[in-house]
């Protein structure tokens, strides 16, 4: 039977084959006519690439069918250089976990009453439970920035 092979240049080659011929045989015949080595050939029929070991009958290629010849592209993306850093990586801050950390904000006196050791921020933006930091001369809210400075006693 006769089949047609259309190349990239638009040229059509006619080949005399049998339906029992393998794709390898067809590629060898194309090499004889065009001089393109079989490892660079890709044959497409009905939108599918034809695999070397299979026969023309496997792909239902009949007389006067047209195969499309495409050349195989070798290689891939360009190799990239490995990035070199001038400074070493910054070590991430590790959060220290302290069990029952809230207990340091409260104290239970002898009568069983719970006393708050830290001053709570009165600002409405901060919300309930926002404690102010105790500094040697002031109380400071880290959320809103409100500061209360201790009064110095005149001696």
Swiss-Prot record:
GO terms for biological process: translation. One of its GO terms (cellular component) is cytoplasm. It comes from the Eukaryota. InterPro entries: Ribosomal_eS31 (IPR002906), Ribosomal_eS31_euk-type_sf (IPR038582), Ribosomal_zn-bd (IPR011332), Ubiquitin-like_dom (IPR000626), Ubiquitin-like_domsf (IPR029071), Ubiquitin_CS (IPR019954), Ubiquitin_dom (IPR019956), Ubiquitin_ubiquitin-like (IPR050158). SMART domains: Ribosomal_S27 (SM01402), UBQ (SM00213). There is a cross-link at residue 76 (Glycyl lysine isopeptide (Gly-Lys) (interchain with K-? in acceptor proteins)). There is a cross-link at residue 48 (Glycyl lysine isopeptide (Lys-Gly) (interchain with G-Cter in ubiquitin)). A zinc finger (C4-type) spans 121-144. GO terms for molecular function: mRNA binding; structural constituent of ribosome; zinc ion binding. CDD domains: Ubl_ubiquitin (cd01803). Keywords: Cytoplasm, Isopeptide bond, Metal-binding, Nucleus, Ribonucleoprotein, Ribosomal protein, Ubl conjugation, Zinc, Zinc-finger. Residues 1-76 form the Ubiquitin-like domain. Ubiquitin is generally synthesized as a polyubiquitin precursor with tandem head to tail repeats. Often, there are one to three additional amino acids after the last repeat, removed in the mature protein. Alternatively, ubiquitin extension protein is synthesized as a single copy of ubiquitin fused to a ribosomal protein (either eL40 or eS31) or to an ubiquitin-related protein (either RUB1 or RUB2). Following translation, extension protein is cleaved from ubiquitin. In the N-terminal section; belongs to the ubiquitin family. In the C-terminal section; belongs to the eukaryotic ribosomal protein eS31 family. PANTHER family: UBIQUITIN. This is Ubiquitin-ribosomal protein eS31 fusion protein. It comes from Lupinus albus (White lupine).
